[in-house]
């Protein structure tokens, strides 16, 4: 990340490392099998009721049922594309880690989501294939949410300056650790985070209420969008008024945080202890939390969840789509009663609170700022005219430094993509 400010005297480069993001939610609307009307999930590849083939069609934003048409093509049964031919992504048909579809005449072997993955784990280790599946699943959920918010994603070959790519790496045998983080448009995830037992050990050791794979993706995407939406833009000075000076020395802040910890009063000003470390991390934590709120409200609305508050003046959950919500205040009014209900349901199940957070007024102001930035970016993107089709995203997939097969079944030279310091 670069600090584009003449006050700094020089650009300050850093690779963000984030050991403790921790949020997960289902941002999906309800999907159904077009053959039998059974409800299906975003990740399903077959209907559990009638065994029909399923796949997600990005241009429809729908799960479609399919008949196998032969020659590697499938015929859609979805009313909006009935009879149209598609192909499963290579990572769907061969690697079993995806369920997205491409038009039959698309020459690309990979879907628009898988094309963003630059490096995959070494598949000679069978556990890594399962971790890869989980990583791709979380990544697709992130991409779904960003698309719903109107935020564009380009691969580096389509946008060398602002493109986004992912690397999924494992620790080396010589003790060198892969640090989850973001640097220069590349998000690196340590595949160990896809191991539930490892992630829970880390969560406990770091005293975190949540630690999820999807949360890592959300947080690191915040760093990526900071570079795209804040650095060097009209938002930089307003950002500093809300979050602080982004030109503060990151390495010193990191060292101070791990030496001294967070201030005792951090819940009054920050969404998490880690957010106190540096304005970059405060932004990324707040960004991730905003995505969580939008995802959960989107899901609740899509499933027809309605709350009947006990008092006439208490906020209610309105039947509106969160990503189209113009009023941030209304968004928050819908959010708080839902969290009360969610936590009450969890307690009735004998489980910990599903939403163990308290949003102080200062935190709500930061969320409001994220909302303003995203809304403005979405409006700007919607107003642009482009000749480039949205499914033209492309990238080259390699393997990690320990070898293995890439998404095309080949074994090209690997690249090392550690993002950290």
Q: Where do the model's predicted regions map?
A:
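Post-HExxH zinc-binding segment in Zn-dependent metallohydrolases
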Residues: 226-281, 287-295
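Short cysteine-rich clusters marking metal-coordination/redox-active sites
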Residues: 33-36, 47-50, 89, 111-114
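Cys/His-rich microdomains that often coordinate metals
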Residues: 37-40, 54, 93-96, 102, ...
């Amino acid at each position: 990340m670069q600090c584009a400010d003449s006050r700094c005297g020089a650009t300050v480069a850093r690779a963000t490392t984030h050991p403790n993001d921790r949020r997960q939610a289902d941002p999906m609307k309800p999907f159904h099998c077009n053959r039998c009307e059974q409800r299906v999930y975003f990740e399903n590849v077959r209907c559990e009721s009638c065994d029909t083939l399923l796949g997600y069609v990005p241009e429809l934003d729908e799960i479609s049922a399919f008949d196998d048409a032969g020659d590697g093509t499938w015929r859609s049964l979805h009313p909006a594309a009935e009879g149209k031919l598609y192909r499963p992504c290579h990572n769907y048909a061969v690697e079993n880690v995806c369920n997205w579809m491409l038009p039959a005449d698309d020459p690309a072997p990979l879907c628009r989501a898988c094309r963003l993955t630059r490096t995959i784990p070494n598949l000679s280790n069978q556990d890594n294939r399962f971790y890869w599946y989980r990583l791709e699943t979380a990544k697709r959920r992130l991409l779904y949410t960003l698309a719903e918010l109107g935020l564009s994603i380009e691969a580096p070959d389509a946008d060398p300056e602002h493109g986004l790519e992912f690397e999924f790496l494992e620790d080396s045998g010589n003790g060198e650790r892969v640090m989850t983080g973001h640097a220069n448009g590349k998000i690196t995830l340590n595949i160990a985070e896809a191991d539930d037992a490892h992630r829970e050990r880390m969560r406990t050791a770091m005293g975190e209420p949540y630690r999820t794979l999807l949360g890592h993706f959300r947080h690191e995407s915040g760093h990526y969008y900071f570079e795209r939406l804040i650095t060097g833009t009209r938002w930089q000075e307003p950002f500093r008024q809300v979050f602080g000076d982004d030109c503060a020395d990151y390495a010193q802040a990191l060292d101070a945080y791990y030496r001294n910890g967070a201030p005792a009063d951090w819940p009054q000003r920050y969404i998490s202890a880690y957010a106190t470390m540096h304005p970059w991390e405060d932004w990324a934590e707040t960004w991730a939390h905003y995505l969580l709120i939008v995802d959960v409200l989107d899901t609740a609305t899509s499933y027809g969840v309605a709350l009947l508050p006990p008092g006439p003046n208490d906020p209610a959950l309105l039947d509106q789509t969160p990503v189209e919500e113009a009023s941030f205040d209304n968004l928050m009014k819908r959010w708080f009663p839902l969290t009360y209900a969610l936590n009450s349901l969890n307690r009735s199940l004998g489980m910990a609170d599903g939403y163990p957070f308290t949003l102080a007024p200062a935190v709500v102001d930061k969320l409001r700022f994220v909302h303003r930035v995203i809304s403005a970016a979405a409006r700007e993107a919607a107003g642009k005219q482009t000749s480039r089709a949205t499914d033209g995203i492309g990238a080259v997939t390699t393997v990690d430094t320990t070898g293995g097969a890439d998404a095309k079944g080949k074994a090209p030279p690997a690249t090392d993509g550690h993002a950290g310091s």
